[in-house]
Regions:
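Histidine-rich, glycine-flanked metal-binding segment
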Residues: 1-51
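Conserved protein kinase catalytic core
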Residues: 13, 52, 62-64, 132-135
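General structural feature for long, well-ordered alpha-helical segments within catalytic domains
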Residues: 19, 27, 74, 78, ...
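Short clusters of hydrophobic/aromatic residues that line enzyme substrate/ligand-binding pockets
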Residues: 31, 65-67, 145
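Metal-coordinating catalytic core of metallo-dependent amide/deamination hydrolases
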Residues: 105-163
């Protein structure tokens, strides 16, 4: 599908400029010089600003959903919310937790990944702990911190399939 977005204020070359642009199959294929293009749809942006999508690399949850306890539907709810706010991609940051709860979060992420979904792209898992120095633990519960453990790390990596 080919869509022309016209009358947009596009962030391009480090500034906003009036530009029309083409989308083909959901991706920008051309910026400027779009007059005369045959399109399936034409959208007048009315001078609104268009910027690249934002990427959130550290998210513990949103819209009442905590990634440590989320099921696949919870991940989908977060994805849709982020997309509505201009975030196009994100990493779920699993807090330091028990092995069982961390494995649950990894399983639910994998379950979500194996379904059809919409909204922002959940790029993978960011394990925030449990291998942290107590002096730099921040808000992580100290009783759940662990000394480095390669077997546990391998178990998490295997469960996540490298995600």
């Amino acid at each position: 599908m080919k869509t022309l977005i016209k009358n947009a204020s596009v962030y391009h070359n480090h500034r906003f400029e009036a530009l029309d642009f083409l989308l083909e199959d959901g991706r920008i294929s051309q910026m400027g010089g779009c007059e005369g293009e045959r399109c399936d749809e034409v959208i007048d942006a009315g001078g609104k600003r268009v910027v690249p999508g934002f990427v959130d690399i550290h998210t513990h949850g949103a819209v009442g959903v905590d990634v440590n306890g989320a099921d696949a539907d919870g991940f989908e709810k977060i994805c849709r919310f982020f997309a509505s706010q201009g975030t196009t991609s994100w990493l779920c940051s699993v807090l330091t937790d028990t092995k069982e709860q961390t494995m649950y979060a990894i399983r639910m992420y994998k379950e979500w990944k194996n379904t059809e979904h919409r909204g922002a792209n959940l790029m993978g898992i960011h394990l925030e702990g449990p291998f942290l120095c107590p002096a730099y633990k921040g808000a992580m519960p100290e009783h759940l911190l662990k000394k480095p453990d390669m077997e546990l790390l391998k178990a998490y990596q295997e469960a996540a399939g490298g995600e």
